[in-house]
């Protein structure tokens, strides 16, 4: 049977989503749980995408398919909940058609980036970016809107892929004591959101011009000197199917 499973996780102590030798990852933890509970050695779960070290998820999705998995959804749900650590929360388990693939069937994803320009909070260090000056929200939005549409994001990624064209469907910001940035796209490249956020902050703090950001979109080049916003403020917010 094939299952679609949604979860959230605190990425602070993980070396990202994807399994890595000798390192703790979300995929690695989950696959070991499946092996332990269901006694299946060759299990492999497929995430909607990868998150990097220190990046969190409000809602990640993965699919898992194996001939030995023949259980009702609630049995899988209860079994996983009983074994996951305190930094992983299983949200939902659904039986799906055998053709479902968590990565390839995703139509878009939304990422969220949390910035604190209000008051330093030691206990939020792993969950937000603190900046020690007030941000001009309007300038952040001006810069963000340059990225909407289909572009070659080679300048705004550290990906080794040759195909670096993606479509950003929408952006928005929300403001209370913190500034929260939302970006929805049909797909994301490695470090793409963090480099977009860093560029927007540089514009807000008068370190880069809108014209320069626009130039890097029109004339993309690998290795453009774009900063990388810290992983701590980044969340995979929602995956759409």
Curated annotation (Swiss-Prot):
SUPFAM superfamilies named among the record's database cross-references: Pseudouridine synthase
Keywords, ordered alphabetically: Isomerase, tRNA processing
Catalyzed chemical reaction(s): uridine(38/39/40) in tRNA = pseudouridine(38/39/40) in tRNA
GO biological process, one term: tRNA pseudouridine synthesis
Cross-referenced CDD domains: PseudoU_synth_EcTruA (cd02570)
InterPro entries on file: PsdUridine_synth_cat_dom_sf (IPR020103), PsdUridine_synth_TruA (IPR001406), PsdUridine_synth_TruA_a/b_dom (IPR020097), PsdUridine_synth_TruA_C (IPR020095), TruA/RsuA/RluB/E/F_N (IPR020094)
Binding, substrate: 111
A GO MF term: RNA binding
EC number: 5.4.99.12
Active site: 52
Family membership: Belongs to the tRNA pseudouridine synthase TruA family.
HAMAP family per UniProt: TruA
Biological role stated in the UniProt entry: Formation of pseudouridine at positions 38, 39 and 40 in the anticodon stem and loop of transfer RNAs.
Subunit-level organization: Homodimer.
Name of this chain's protein: tRNA pseudouridine synthase A
Provenance organism: Ureaplasma parvum serovar 3 (strain ATCC 700970)
């Amino acid at each position: 049977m094939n299952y679609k499973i949604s979860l959230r996780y605190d990425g602070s102590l993980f070396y990202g989503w994807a399994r890595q030798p000798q390192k703790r990852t979300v995929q690695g933890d989950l696959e070991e749980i499946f092996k332990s509970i269901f006694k299946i050695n060759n299990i492999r779960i497929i995430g909607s995408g990868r998150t990097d070290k220190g990046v969190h998820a409000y809602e990640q999705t993965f699919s898992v398919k194996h001939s030995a998995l023949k259980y009702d959804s609630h049995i899988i749900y209860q079994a996983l909940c009983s074994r996951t650590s305190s930094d992983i929360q299983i949200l939902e388990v659904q039986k799906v058609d055998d053709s479902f693939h968590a990565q390839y069937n995703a139509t878009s994803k939304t990422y969220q980036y949390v910035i604190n320009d209000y008051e330093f909070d030691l206990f939020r260090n792993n969950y937000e970016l603190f900046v020690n000056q007030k941000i001009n929200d309007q300038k952040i939005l001006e810069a963000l809107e340059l990225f909407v549409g289909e572009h070659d994001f080679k300048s705004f990624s550290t990906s080794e892929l040759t195909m670096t064209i993606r479509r950003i469907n929408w952006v928005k910001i929300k403001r209370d004591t913190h500034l929260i940035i939302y970006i929805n796209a049909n797909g994301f490249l490695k470090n793409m959101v963090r480099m977009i956020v860093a560029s927007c902050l540089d514009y807000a703090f008068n370190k880069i011009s809108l014209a320069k950001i626009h130039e890097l979109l029109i004339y993309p080049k690998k290795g453009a000197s774009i900063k990388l916003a810290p992983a701590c403020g980044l969340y995979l917010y929602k995956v759409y199917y």
